[in-house]
A protein has these predicted regions:
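Classical Sec-dependent N-terminal signal peptides that target proteins to the secretory pathway
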Residues: 2-21
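Active-site microenvironments of metalloenzymes and redox enzymes
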Residues: 51, 100-108, 120-231, 237, ...
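Chymotrypsin/trypsin-fold serine protease catalytic domain
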Residues: 226-252
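Hydrophobic alpha-helical segments, especially N-terminal targeting/anchoring helices
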Residues: 81, 266-269
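Surface-exposed recognition segments
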Residues: 106-119, 225, 248-251, 269-378
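Short, small/polar residue-rich loop motifs at catalytic or cofactor-binding pockets
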Residues: 258-261
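N-terminal pre-domain segments of enzymes
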Residues: 26-83, 364-378
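Mature N-terminal segment immediately following signal peptide/propeptide cleavage
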Residues: 84-100
Length: 378
């Protein structure tokens, strides 16, 4: 009896050991499978991430290639303002890098022109000349635009999109101040007015137009040069390229009558100062501490904004490629429209603008941002 009991206990113990071993083996097998599964999932996750990055890289390469192909096909063209008969010329500006600002040893430089920074610029077109009264008047005087279109046989209903753009109230003084209109640069507008013109022009033409950024303006003005002016450092040559205080007969002159810069742009030095989009800061380009692409300092304050190029009133030093000048609220002290339209007119008879058209069309949100840099009237 005792012997049988001992045998039974031995058999039970043996089965228990076998069971424990099987359980242990099964547990290890399960853990191994789980680890294999986790390793596989991790590998799949890494693979997915690499695949996504690869897709992003491929997309970037495709876009870059397409942009290069598009840029290679960029040519000068003449833009027509629908229904009016008015036209203006646009010049292609290639992408590239340049040193923005003036070196410390440049004569007559100001602190706000530095420090010099290397900047990358995307391709765009720029108007060959400053915006003329011939084009701007159609925006400023809505009734004149309608009359011109009617004479040319166009129905008012074709203007619905451009008619929705805000425009100035009709000024009660002659805005050229007797200096001439046909072929002369438009003057005395606020930055907001220039922006609204660009918006109206885009609606009229089907091409996206805006003011240039400060970096785009200087890049186009320099046209590959590193000197104080696009024609070199010798101020004695300035009469060939610019209207300024000593040769302007105390008024602006017809656009495009002086020599162009190396890229075919006229009056980048002198005639009228030109609005750009950026906020003005006295410490210049300190925010650019490395190579930056298409920089643009969006304005949070109404004053000051940047103007470029110098004007018919200025000295040669103010016409340098790197020279910059801040806008002032004083320019509105004798606003010919006060108090009705403080958003559109100034008495700054030296101030105008020219338009640019980026090669790549931005989103509608970006368009709105560029067109509302001076805020919107209440």
């Amino acid at each position: 009896m005792l012997r049988s009991l001992i045998i039974l206990l031995s058999v039970f113990s043996a089965f228990s050991l076998i069971g424990n071993e099987e359980t242990s083996v099964a547990k290890k097998s399960l853990e191994s499978k789980t680890n294999d599964k986790n390793d596989k999932q991790q590998k799949e996750d890494v693979s997915d991430e690499l695949s996504e990055k690869n897709t992003v890289d491929i997309r970037l390469k495709i876009i870059t290639s397409q942009i290069k192909n598009l840029e290679a096909s960029m040519k000068p063209y003449t833009e027509s303002i629908f229904g009016t008969g008015e036209k203006f010329e646009m010049i292609p500006i290639p992408s590239g890098q340049f040193f923005m600002g003036s070196p410390e040893n440049e004569n007559d430089r100001s602190e706000s022109e530095g420090p010099v920074n290397e900047v990358k610029i995307s391709p765009f077109w720029m108007a060959k000349t400053e915006t003329t009264w011939n084009c701007y008047t159609l925006f400023m005087y809505a009734e004149e635009e309608k009359m011109v279109m009617k004479i040319r046989g166009y129905k008012p209903g074709l203007n619905k999109v451009s008619d929705a753009v805000a425009r100035p109230t009709t000024p009660y003084v002659e805005m050229s101040f007797g200096m001439g209109t046909d072929g002369f640069p438009a003057i005395s507008m606020t930055q907001h007015a220039a922006n609204m013109y660009c918006k109206w022009l885009s609606a009229k033409t089907g091409h996206y137009y805006r003011l240039p950024t400060e970096a785009e303006w200087e890049y186009a003005c320099r046209a590959g040069t590193k000197t104080a002016f696009s024609f070199g450092d010798d101020e004695k040559l300035i009469d060939e390229y610019a209207w300024y205080g000593d040769n302007s007969d105390e008024k602006y002159q017809k656009v495009g009558t002086k020599k162009p810069n190396p890229w075919g742009l006229h009056d980048m030095h002198g005639n009228v100062s030109e609005w750009v989009l950026d906020q003005f800061f006295e410490d210049g380009y300190n925010k650019y501490n490395e190579i930056v692409s298409d920089p643009f300092i969006y304005g949070k304050e109404l004053y000051p904004r940047v103007t470029r190029g110098g004007s018919w009133m200025d000295s040669p030093a103010d016409l340098r490629s790197a020279a910059r000048y801040p806008s002032s609220e004083d320019w509105k002290e004798q606003d010919p429209q006060l108090p009705q339209s403080i958003w559109y007119h100034t008495d700054a008879q030296f101030l105008g603008f020219r338009v640019v058209r980026p090669l790549i069309i931005p989103s509608s949100e970006e368009m709105h941002k560029y067109w509302t840099t001076e805020g919107e009237p209440d």
